[in-house]
Amino acid sequence: MSSAGGGAAPRLTATPGTAIVHLKVEQASYAHLATDRSAPTFTLGPVSFEAQGQELVAILGPNASGKSTLLTLLAGLNKPLSGRIEVDGNEVSQLELRARAQRIALVQQESELLFPLRVWEYVLQGRYPYQRRLRFESDEDCLFAGNALAQVGADLLRDRWMDQLSGGEKQRVILARALAQQPSLLLLDEPTQHLDIGGKVELLRRLRRLADTHRYAVMVVTHELDLASEFCDRIVLLHKGRCLRVGTPAEVYERAVLEEVFEAPLEVEMRPNGRPRVILQGS
């Protein structure tokens, strides 16, 4: 828990971390059981892919394709009905809560805070997997919270109130809270949803830098085809609960496949850097 007033935190410079991870998803499937008997049951899978530290992976697909459902399986919030999801050889759903939170951080779609918090207090909440019950934060907690703020360029925000931040500032602080957990696997559910184009590019650049420099495996649920192509190493493409393609953007971005998935007339052209660009026909 944070001490009253948030306390003065040490001002630290982030250094490249040692996080490295191997995520293995093997024939994982899941089903949402409908509460209304007349409604169809949504089924995801089977899904298979792997991800490593220093990789930025996008989970792409239209609404109701299973992207967020897959993320809850990766985070261990739900258990696959069949198949396995492992992090460094450990089955995610079998990990004890604190042990899982020390390996995996999930940034869900933005929700309202129940009570006002300063940025520093909010980021310190990310240290819960390491804190003993009814204890104030330790020097080590402050060290990692300060490093997390530095990693996202939010040092100067530490004394601000969360409800006074802009959309881009708030997204950086939410990311810092996740980084304070010291995860090796970072999962984000549509983090660009409320950002303008400049904010979206800045966030993807930051995630790319976190993967490259701090060796996280980063997985992002997004609708942003072009940004995913530009910044991500690999794509997991979902459609109606099925995993259609897994591969590099150049391997996945086939015109006929994307038109089927997104139900729109599209063109795919290659940029000089070898990454595909998707153009909506008639735009």
Language model segments and positions:
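The feature captures the beta-strand-to-loop junction immediately N-terminal to the Walker
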Residues: 60-62
